[in-house]
Amino acid sequence: MLDHGTPIQPVSLPAAELDLGAVGGIAWPEPVQRRLRVGLLNNMPDSALVQTERQFRRLIGPGVELRLFSLDTVPRGPLARAHLDRFYETQGALAGAGLDALVVTGAEPKAERLADEPFFPALAAVVDWADASGVPTLFSCLAAHAAVLHLDGIERRPLPTKHSGIYACTAVAHHPLLAGMPASVPVPHSRWNDLPEQALTARGYRVLRRSEQVGVDLFVRERGASMVFLQGHPEYDGDTLAREYRRDIGRFLDGERDTPPALPENYYVDEAVLRLDAFAAVARAYRSPALHADFPTMAETLPRPAAWQEAAAGLFRNWLALVSDRVALAA
């Protein structure tokens, strides 16, 4: 059966209050300084809202106070709105929250131009606040695109085909964010747009990690407030790309998109690739919503082990160590 993604479920605690312990068997050290307070501005669509909370909670680790924030201009259904009303604060509360750092997630794009998205003005205001306040901020995927567009007028460019899969990303600079990490690490990417590396470096951004296949992965701003930008998704669970693929092929069957999606690259085990390729051929030939029932199950189409999670945890540990050092210097 086709899985359209995990809907929001009522929970007794938000991800901000869960202690998820280790990531991929990695034990988190005790905080070096006082307990940090980190904000998560979650702009993901309803179907991924709670999952995204948990993913970033896992990477931020225990011993950190996580505060949840949302933009009023991201469209929400009633169940998601109830969750936000219970566990989240609005964008207006950011300034008085006493944050040591902020993570800003991506969002599901709807408009052809990023500046035309209904949430763009509010997101731009958050970028301005982070820049003026000096709060270290990490921007993920679409949020990274929005930030550099607002700060420096760097337009993202549409890709001929979607970058979807696990890609080897190689360090191209020395930086504390990469301390203790291998020179090349796997990173999930899932995006229809790209930031040109030349445009970033011309405006003073420093690329730290890139891929021969998908371009810039990780970069930082060299002036002003501390800002980190990710085009990839190190926070992803092992099955996230699988769920995105199932969602997109479902949209093809339902006539919501013109072409079927390509399989995520370097992601599925060989047997799963054969099963999914066979189904995609049937879907192209006999496109119909009735084919939802014939889609191979998740158990029949296993992805490879989530080899990126150790490096993802290392990146966030290094980022939080830099935040902790900044807090100690300001004390």
UniProtKB/Swiss-Prot annotation:
Cystine crosslinks: none
Family annotation (InterPro entries): Class_I_gatase-like, MetA_family
Protein EC: 2.3.1.46
Site positions for Important for substrate specificity: 190
Regions annotated as coiled coil: none
Assigned GO CC terms: cytoplasm
GO terms of biological process kind: methionine biosynthetic process
Active site: 141, 233, 235
Catalytic activity: L-homoserine + succinyl-CoA = O-succinyl-L-homoserine + CoA
Site (Important for acyl-CoA specificity): 108, 142
HAMAP family tied to this protein: MetA_acyltransf
Protein name: Homoserine O-succinyltransferase
